[in-house]
Amino acid sequence: MLSLEKGQSLSLTKPDGSSIQKVRVGLSWDVASIGSNVDLDLFVVHKESKKVAFFNDKTAISGIKLSDDNLTGEGEGDDEFTELDATKTDDGDYYICVNIYDAKSRKQAFNLVNNAKATIYNNETNTALASYSITEDGGQNTGIIVAKLKDVGGSYEFTALGEYIVGDINEIAQVVFRK
């Protein structure tokens, strides 16, 4: 499995050059100290339609499906994930984002999170293609635009962005809409 750094991209194609039509992006994390409860929420923003799929509306975007909300990050493997079915999606780019739920009132930030990473899979074969660490330099930020799934004429390219933000889901979505 490839380990991506900020700014690196991965073409989502099969060895024969055809497009991977179904991908999954998983998010895993641990809390920095025992007894803490930090709820990270994975959500997807479709820039062109200005739609957001998140824990209260998991199917807001055609072709996108979100997993159930993991409130603690406990356990092995991916804590939350999103699936993209390219045969059902609209044209345009999809942004994979994460925020800390209710961070402002809970006085929480990414400095309370360890080992957070995003992993992209070929969901047709359940094969991990690449991972990207997202907890470096999180500091007092409460959200991050993790990656972009760029539509490149019938297939997608995954780009690790790592853009930290202080904001909730709405504020992060507004940043994406302005891109």
From Swiss-Prot:
The protein's matches in Pfam families, at most eight in alphabetical order, are given as: TerD (PF02342)
Q: Per its UniProt entry, which superkingdom is the organism in?
A: Bacteria
Q: Which residues cross the membrane?
A: none
* Coiled coil start-end: none
Matching entries from InterPro entries are given as:
Stress/Tellurium_Resist (IPR051324), TerD (IPR003325)
Family indicated by similarity: Belongs to the CAPAB/TerDEXZ family.
Q: What is this protein called?
A: Uncharacterized protein slr1764
